[in-house]
């Protein structure tokens, strides 16, 4: 049943631990600044940080003014660099510091990379600002003024280019842009990422004015997303001159459009912001979203780095519910948006067909409830009466009084046209016709009921000229947890893009957002009761007390886990071993053996049930994970192994 890969597992997982540092600058005192930098290098080594980024011109201070015109000043900075270089001996932390570097009579504002006692490369700033409060052109020239791709620093000839790529193992490729480079219309990181950079470093000295922090955060977030890369941003703070400006020491670590870690809003004298960047995810996204026109980036300069401790890096926290926003306000807004997407899809189908009746089977469970609420929302927006929503309960051998009662209440309170059709007699007759024993509770026993219900819905829809609305969700479709040509089939499937872990929040949100449209307080109570029910298809007989016996998660494992697996398998393209490692962090209270067993189930069912997905009805996509064979997922139904 398991889909384990027999090859040796990759224990690297593609994570890279990076930190951005701000510290109190001793303005103009290069040796004191070197001391403070060394202190952070030692700390980074102790904390197994692989990349440590300091602010722009941190060795001297950014606001030294005409001191940058003094040859002795930048010569002393180079001399102080010796202490920093020595501090990188005996560890493998890749260190990026900002300092002035002179070459052929020109002064460049540079990022200098050091690792294991050697200088790996020097990157000069390209866009040198000279407006408002910035006068950098008074002292520095652009990278376009360099005359060679190497430079002498501390007696060594090292790479010197704004197009420097620092290359390591496991797809770690580091490029650099410095402060203003990010703020222009075409940041260097865009081109460098197309040349292969997977992580962008930005040593910065960005002063603060009202609103600038939010703008800066958005720049970093969006650029990391546009480049599909990690982004480490470190800005100067305390110690810079306050003659005219204030620097807050804004530090961020971002990945692929998301801020992983950030310094506090209040100004901190000292901060080390640490984030674990998923390089593999960035590379997988580039492979998937490959609409970029390939261009040859000329004059790329490469330098090799050692990616230290890569196999041992894992994040401390992993979000267990990737489909569900943690923040309550954000979650409510997201749910409102999803409900509208679902409703809009159905509205278009109604307009296009001219069919203004819908038929939906109501079980009293979450999925059919959500589908019904979407129908109500669509009909309200179209100005159609809810009486044209035809809701049918079809009690069978496993239907409980509780779910039947909730279904009846819901249909009545939502002003739909409702009726009940008991399927037990029809199913018994069918079992008799095909020679199936009444007391053998196998897959045939279950599917007979599911297909009987589907037959009723389609025949009734023919009778009233209506559309059958599908209720199955994204998670069920991924696992094939539906009866082929039973609940698998409909005229339009409104829940097909919604993962199971999100369904209850959508029902809950409808109850809150559209409370006035629902009618009575009791309807809201019914919805809350439905949210609390265990998940079950109710296809097996109830116990002697009429209680539910069949519970889906006891058969296939927790949907919390399945949705986690689904997200990371499809959205991020991760392999089995990495998904297992992340799940163990995300669900610390679940035994690893249970996680592994459920993951085996996921892999097996996802592969073997593709034949159901190959012929699914139309339904709207609502998120980045979708399973339509006409869109996001193209797989053969007879795949022998899944990776």
Annotated model-derived regions:
Residues 1-361, 372-373, 377-388, 418:
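Enzyme catalytic cores with a strong preference for nitrogen-chemistry domains
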Residues 16-17, 33, 170, 227-229, ...:
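ATP/NTP-dependent adenylation/nucleotidyl-transfer catalytic domains that generate, transfer
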